[in-house]
């Protein structure tokens, strides 16, 4: 078969399922891939096929293999999406197609990492073995977690990230520029976590302020340690005063800035000029 020959054995129901899964129409698909709408409509009506290049573009768009669209029968969602993915999709049904693709890309990277770890001598490689935390005392939970991570008094996002990865949590930060690893600036999602007993994952959206990224990182860690579940969070979740979000917000705040750090602030030394507050609180801000 040459690249220009048309493949006739395409399963149109699988294209329809992918469009529904991504929340797009056939017109959207055609527009995004620069394929004539009429061509896709003929495929959906089983009146014509499409070239291998066209099918490959559709497969890459949905993050699937070409053979996925040649298989007969309906899609088994339990085989296509992991339980963690379905958890995130159920929490935020309005997730964009690009963000869903990013979640699946992160899952694939985790699979690659675990596969490499099996092939290599991984006896000394960190494994995710979280401490038992009290859910009824969030300050104590934060103290235990901070000790588990081995944090110093002053930290940055990179040192927090290194501490988590030393405990078997994979941490990704999205790109600030357009690309496959970007969470779009206009997208309200700030981060997500994938709970897995073998290898948990946290993804943090790149933001202007590093302190915001650090809070998002520890917010997601709270979901993993306190609730042992996957989660995806936006600005509203990181300011929520209800339920699990309230708990992980309190946990993240206490982990980043323990009460002992707050009591070390001397009000008598507070500068009269507000512009000097950054330098006055520099050590506490880098906790």
Where are each of the predicted segments found?
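Short juxta-domain linker segments that transition from a proline/glycine-rich
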Residues: 1-287
């Amino acid at each position: 078969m040459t690249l220009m020959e048309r493949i006739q054995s395409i399963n149109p129901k699988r294209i329809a399922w992918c469009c529904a899964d991504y929340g797009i129409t056939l017109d959207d698909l055609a527009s995004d891939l620069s394929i004539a709408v009429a061509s896709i409509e003929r495929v959906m009506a089983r009146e014509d096929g499409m070239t291998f290049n066209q099918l490959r573009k559709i497969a890459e768009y949905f993050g699937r293999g070409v053979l996925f669209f040649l298989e007969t029968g309906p899609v088994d969602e339990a085989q296509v999406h992991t339980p963690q993915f379905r958890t995130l999709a159920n929490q935020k049904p309005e997730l964009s197609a690009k963000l869903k693709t990013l979640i699946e890309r992160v899952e694939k990277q985790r699979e690659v990492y675990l596969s490499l770890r099996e092939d290599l001598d991984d006896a000394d490689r960190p494994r995710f073995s979280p401490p038992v935390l009290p859910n009824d005392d969030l300050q104590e939970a934060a103290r235990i977690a901070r000790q588990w991570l081995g944090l110093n008094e002053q930290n940055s996002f990179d040192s927090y990230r290194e501490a988590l990865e030393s405990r078997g949590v994979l941490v990704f930060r999205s790109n600030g520029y357009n690309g496959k690893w970007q969470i779009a600036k206009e997208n309200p999602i700030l981060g997500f976590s994938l709970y897995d007993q073998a290898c948990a994952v946290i993804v943090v959206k790149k933001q202007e302020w590093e302190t915001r990224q650090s809070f998002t990182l520890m917010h997601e860690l709270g979901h993993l340690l306190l609730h042992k579940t996957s989660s995806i969070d936006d600005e509203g979740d990181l300011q929520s005063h209800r339920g699990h979000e309230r708990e992980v917000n309190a946990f993240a705040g206490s982990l980043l800035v323990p009460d002992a750090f707050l009591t070390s602030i001397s009000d008598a030394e507070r500068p009269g000029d507000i512009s000097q507050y950054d330098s006055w609180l520099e050590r506490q801000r880098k906790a």
